Amino acid sequence: MPGALHRAITPAVLLLTQALSSPSAAATSTGTAVIIFLDFSGSIQSGERARYQREIETLILPSLSAGDRLLMAPIHDKTLTEFRPLVQVILPAKPEFSGWRDNVLTYKRRVKEVETQVLDLKAKVKTEVAGVMGKRYSSPYTDIFSSLLIAQKLFHDEPRRKVLVLLSDMIEDTPEYNFEKIAWSPSAVEKLLAELEAKALIPKLLGVCVYVSGASAKSAALAEDIARFWEGYFRRSGADMQPSRYAHVLLHWPPSQSCHQQ
């Protein structure tokens, strides 16, 4: 009988031990990594930049929580050769609770301390964003392709959920590719995508949730052609880019948990 009792109790003890000591009992999520590329080309007017700033300050920043990462970088004509983040922060993660080692009151105090740190860092980032947006940047070209290659590097081995936000009109404008001068057609899109793929200019963004805010062009027809190109581009990159998240303003924010799932 004692042996039977021991056999009955042992699994229960093991389950209790796992529940109290396993991080999954009260583990924090891995968080979200939000990378923002901001268009500083001459085609972006001051009104558009002001809207970008509002979207960062009123939508993106408030959605960040403990454990999240934010990086903001420019889209300009020297993205690859002179890349430098404009703003970056990693918010401290919420502490995990273990029934074996943690006192409840002590744990709650640690959580409160982290929450205060997160609020302070977000306020600091808001000030930094305002400082960046207040400066006079103006690039002669818009090299979005290079920015997306940088995004691939930034997301490499990133354990957090990956979200890419492009604040741009999405008009590539470089000596090699000028979207306003292309005679757009379905065959032209496929030809350009094949050329970019052959030149290794389509990054690997598998599992990255993509948002575009600021998409525009001189005509509705051109805007639609460019949107169709980017739809094919991101599909080849492996990113999660839905047409509903490609717009003139930031829509459907914050990202749903299913955004990065293919």
Briefly describe each language-model feature range.
Residues 187-262:
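Von Willebrand factor type A / integrin I
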Residues 44-48, 80-84, 173-177, 219-224, ...:
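Extracytoplasmic/secreted cell-surface and envelope-processing proteins
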Residues 1-10:
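Bacterial N-terminal signal peptides that target proteins for export
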Residues 30-159, 162-166, 172:
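Von Willebrand factor
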Residues 24-28:
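Boundary at the C-terminal end of the N-terminal hydrophobic targeting segment
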Residues 10-19:
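Bacterial N-terminal signal peptides
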Residues 30-44, 127-133, 210-214:
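Acidic/histidine-rich, surface-exposed loop or edge segments in extracytoplasmic proteins
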